[in-house]
Regions:
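N-terminal leader/targeting and assembly helices and adjacent pre-domain segments
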Residues: 1-11, 15
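Amphipathic interaction/junction segments at domain boundaries or subunit interfaces
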Residues: 14-20, 24-111
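C-terminal non-catalytic interaction appendages of large macromolecular assemblies
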Residues: 93-96, 103-160
Length: 160
């Protein structure tokens, strides 16, 4: 299940295994694991969004990120991390990528607890809102049963 290179194993395991363990423990105790983990994902995502905003609001940082958005997205969701994706548009107007297969979702599914990773998706969606001058949208997610996660990023000088 955690096959592949050591970096990929560490990346997938560090994110998925704690979520699956919490999901199983909460379910065993009779708690609504999905709601609790999703609330945690939302809260942590908002917290990370604040950190992301502080960093990216430093003058020049958001422009630098946008000029290298393709490299940035490679580091966050590249094939070297186990994602399968399709680039649908490139800057300057928009950077769009469809994630067709997510290593987090695949590992959780193999472990029999695919709903455990919904909290990671929610955290991701919340913290990506923190980017200064970069507008982020995602309307679908593989973990929610969709064909893809539809990431769309646009540079927006008016977004604070």
């Amino acid at each position: 299940m955690l096959s592949g290179n050591a970096a990929l194993k560490k990346h997938k395991g560090a994110m998925v295994l704690p979520a699956v363990a919490l999901y199983r423990a909460l379910t065993a105790s009779g708690a609504d694991a999905v709601d609790l983990l999703n609330a945690y994902g939302d809260a942590m995502g908002r917290r990370f969004a604040g950190i992301v905003h502080c960093i990216t609001s430093v003058p020049g940082v958001s422009g630098l990120i946008w000029r290298h958005v393709d490299s940035f997205m490679d580091r966050m969701s590249g094939e070297n991390l186990g994602y399968q994706r399709r680039i649908v548009s490139e800057p300057p107007e928009m950077f769009g990528v469809d994630i067709l297969s997510c290593p987090y979702h695949e590992l959780a599914r193999k472990l029999g607890n695919e709903k455990a990773v919904l909290c990671i998706c929610r955290m991701d969606k919340a913290y990506m809102q923190g980017f200064y001058r970069i507008r982020y949208e995602r309307t679908t997610a593989v973990s929610e049963g969709a064909e893809c996660c539809d990431y769309r990023l646009r540079f927006d000088p008016e977004k604070k």
